[in-house]
Amino acid sequence: MITVEAFKKYFQRDFPFLPTEYEESEKFNYILDEDIEKAMGEMKALLPVSVFEDEVLEIAQMYLTAHCLVGDIRRSNQGLASNFTFPLQSRSVGSVSESYGIPQKFLSSPSYAYYTTTDYGLKYFALLYPRTRGHVQTVTGWTLP
């Protein structure tokens, strides 16, 4: 299982973590250890541990925790969260344009739509989805003649 310190190291460029020296009045401008611990608790409730190989499990835990953390922070900033839009579908700058869409079957699914609300959730979903389709396990054994 991941730790707060491991999470901070993995996402050191992604989040403004609380520095060791800070003014008390600026404390809530940063991500606190308590915020990460809360998100880790949510991750534990959502993560299907048995689906992931040992080498991938920690990465899945990191991205699902980050997804939960972003959702928690957005919800705590009520006004900001109320105007959230889904990930980019298309944009143009001059003569250059890009577009993509999240397939409707994911957006319509109560199980999957939640993961499409942040980039971290999409990254986690990219790890999860292929492991939940056509997943086969074999069991060795024999029968008596």
Describe the function of each predicted region.
Residues 1-60, 117-145:
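Conserved short "hinge" loops at termini or chain/domain junctions
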Residues 59-74:
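Short, hydrophobic/amphipathic alpha-helical patches that form generic packing surfaces
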Residues 70-145:
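Short loop/turn elements at secondary-structure junctions
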